[in-house]
Every structure is written in structure tokens, then in C-alpha cells.
Amino acid sequence: MTQQITLIKDKILSDNYFTLHNITYDLTRKDGEVIRHKREVYDRGNGATILLYNAKKKTVVLIRQFRVATWVNGNESGQLIETCAGLLDNDEPEVCIRKEAIEETGYEVGEVRKLFELYMSPGGVTELIHFFIAEYSDNQRANAGGGVEDEDIEVLELPFSQALEMIKTGEIRDGKTVLLLNYLQMSHLID
């Protein structure tokens, strides 16, 4: 018997920036027992992220920006080193990530390669992230990057070996970034 889910109630607790739901549902377990659950679910939309790499120079492009949630959770400066990313906002993932790459890093990338889609925090967050990589070159630099409007983004071009070391030292603690850097290492796109 497969599990069945019956929605009992979906109450919106907040929709100031993203939407926080309080969801009550019945879950019919495999043994037939029905269990009522009440959970908060945070809907922030789906997103996309991309790691830019240069195989010849053996470098990657990352960004550093303030992330309030990390600051609240003990990251004293709130600064996080991560891959370029953004919410889809009704765009297709590839369209989104091309826009974000130009806005945040300044690079207008050519061919992008989609790797996978992952739920990063499925216990309470709806977001599905689309993961991409793309090779970049210096002549693809369209502007200085840094984000738009209220963003204050620092663009970092780092040796790939240094970025991997920064995972070990704790300087890089963003999940999507660690995944993409490890993927790049395992795939031997930079040797």
C-alpha cells in the first residue's frame, strides 16, 4: 500500500517576502494507520545556481554576500561565499541562471550544462534548485558584476584548488557551492 496524503488545512502565517504556510494533513501510513500532522512549510519559490570555471586557468568564479539567515544562526559577519544563484521568478532555469550570472558575476556565459535538481531542505522548505556549470573566459566579462539594487556582491575569481581548500577550512559553508565544487572535482573538468 502506498502512502496517501489528505490536506486538512493550509493557513498562511506570513507572506511578507516569501510565504510561510501552516499545513495540517493526514498521512495514511503503509500499514493503513492514519496520522495527523501539522507542519510549517516555507515557500520561497524555486531557484537555480551555476558554477563558472575556467579549465585553462584552473579557476572558478564565486561571490561573497551578506546572508541574514546565516548571521542569525551564528555567522558573525553574515558574509557567505557561494555560487551565483537566484530565484526563477517565472523564468526557465537556464534563462534565470544566465541573467544571474551577468548581474552577479559580470560574465555572459556561453554554453551552460544542467547537472541536476535538488531539494536542499525538504523538511520544511519547498525550494527546488536547478544546478548548472559553465566554462567562462576573460573575454566573456560584460561588466563588473556585483548584483542589482540592494545587493552588495563581491566577485571572487579563485584558483580551484584554493576553493576546495576553503571547504576544508570552513570558509565555504554554502551547501550548493560545496556540491558544485565537489562535482567539478569528481568530473575532472579541471585537472
Curated annotation (Swiss-Prot):
This protein's GO CC annotations: cytosol
Record keyword Metal-binding present: yes
Co-factor(s): Mg(2+)
Protein name: GDP-mannose pyrophosphatase
Subunit and interaction comment: Homodimer.
EC annotation from Swiss-Prot or TrEMBL: 3.6.1.-
Taxon lineage: Bacteria, Pseudomonadati, Pseudomonadota, Gammaproteobacteria, Enterobacterales
Binding site for Mg(2+) 2: E100, E104, E151
Domain Nudix hydrolase per the UniProt entry, residue ranges: 43-180
Xref: SUPFAM superfamilies: Nudix
Protein source organism: Shigella dysenteriae serotype 1 (strain Sd197)
Residues reported in the UniProt entry to bind Mg(2+) 1: A85, E104
Amino acids binding GDP-alpha-D-mannose: Y17, K38, R39, E40, R67, A85, G86, L87, E104, E127, D150, E151, K176
Keyword field contains Metal-binding: yes
Ranges spanned by the short sequence motif Nudix box, renumbered to the chain: 86-106
Catalytic activity annotation: GDP-alpha-D-mannose + H2O = alpha-D-mannose 1-phosphate + GMP + 2 H(+)
Function: Nucleoside diphosphate sugar hydrolase that hydrolyzes GDP-mannose as its preferred substrate, yielding GMP and mannose-1-phosphate.
GO molecular function, one term: hydrolase activity, acting on acid anhydrides, in phosphorus-containing anhydrides
GO terms of biological process kind: nucleoside phosphate metabolic process; ribose phosphate metabolic process
Keywords, in A-Z order: Hydrolase, Magnesium, Metal-binding
Family per similarity comment: Belongs to the Nudix hydrolase family. NudK subfamily.
Record text about domains: In the dimer, the N-terminal domains are swapped between the two monomers, such that residues of both chains contribute to the active site.
